[in-house]
Amino acid sequence: VMYLTAMIPGATFVPGETCLILDELQECPEARTALKFFKTDGRYDVICTGSLLGVSGYGTKKKKKDQKKGTSVPVGYETIVDMNPLDFEEFLWANGITPEIIDFLHECLKKEVPVPEAIHNRMNDLFLQYIVVGGMPEAVGTFLQNHDIGQVLQVQRNIVDEYKDDMVKYADDADKPKIRECFESIPRQLAKENKKFQYATIRKGARSSEYLGSLQWIEDAGIISRCYNLTQTELPLDGNAEDDVFKVYMRDSGLFLSMLEQGTQSDVLQGNLLGYKGSIFENIIADVFSKMGRDLYYYHKESGLEVDFLMRYKGQITLVEVKSTTGNIKSTKTILKNKNVYHVNSAIKLGRYNVGRDGETLTLPLYMAFLLTAY
């Protein structure tokens, strides 16, 4: 504190009242180590913010060859809060949608009755906007100021560029090009018919052993989420997940779209989501589920049977199909018909629909995905 007052003339530290905020904590690992002493001292509250704090190797950044020893993390002396981009509900609040409207949507879901047309159309429009804008605070703020998608896109591309800069700045030298190659391959991975993450898509001849750590770095940085294939459609889901068979989704839909072809935003706002083999739809639902704290799973068999997502809903395993059109859900129907094999009794179809039911399949509009809590 003495040094801080020397560096900030006029600053007054009042025990029990002063809160010290340390931004960009990753730039100075020693500052994080100092939290132990602030906690022990007890006179001042300290809030720290920063990116990449979850990345393996934090505190071992090497600027010189002789700087090999990392700094210690003050275990037990800090409370960690993971901050995510705005989820869809928060985006609704920012756009003036009241809690009463959201409660009404909950009731429509609970009673399985259609949402009135005026509200339904408004929610559809807002969801399309959320797909394009995403939840990064600066992007949302820019959108709310003038609704200029061009300006929003520039903000998003700046953020993506900052991600790439961080990869160069904080990763080990040997990993830097591989991390960037992994990151830049994500749109190509999702544009494939089979969206399973394939290392050969990064670079011809690439092997998993070369890129496993690079992909983990991007995930630890909070940029992507993995969606694991299940060996069987039974609970517990995590116990049936294949660690080496997975899809990768961007954790912010707006940033994902900013990495795609120019004009994609206009297509989405006009309701045209057929491009990229349904990846835009899948990514936004993965985005929504991830921000709810859900782990992501899907089901794929070599026979061609595939379901976009599986989750625990109302205490049981539930299939979730995401449709860019009012298409067929052949795999879901096959699984539901063969309960003795797959042990599944319910499914949800998300798409450009209103609320409805067809036997064991609950049909919902895309914008209701955020209401699908586990119980």
Where are these regions (language model features)?
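Short glycine-rich substrate-engagement loop in P-loop NTPases that contacts/grips substrate
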Residues: 1-16
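Interdomain motor-coupling "hinge/lid" segment immediately C-terminal to the ATP-binding subdomain
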Residues: 50, 56-191
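Domain-level recognition of nuclease-like catalytic cores that cleave nucleotide substrates
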Residues: 353-375
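Active-site ExK catalytic segment of metal-dependent nucleases
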Residues: 319-327
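Structural recognition of the conserved hydrophobic beta-strand(s) that form the central parallel beta-sheet
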Residues: 21, 45-51, 82
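Conserved P-loop NTPase "ATPase switch" module shared by AAA+ and STAND
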Residues: 13-31
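Active-site-adjacent loop/helix micro-motif of nuclease/hydrolase catalytic cores
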Residues: 30, 326-336
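Accessory nucleic acid-recognition modules appended to NTPase machines
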Residues: 141-314
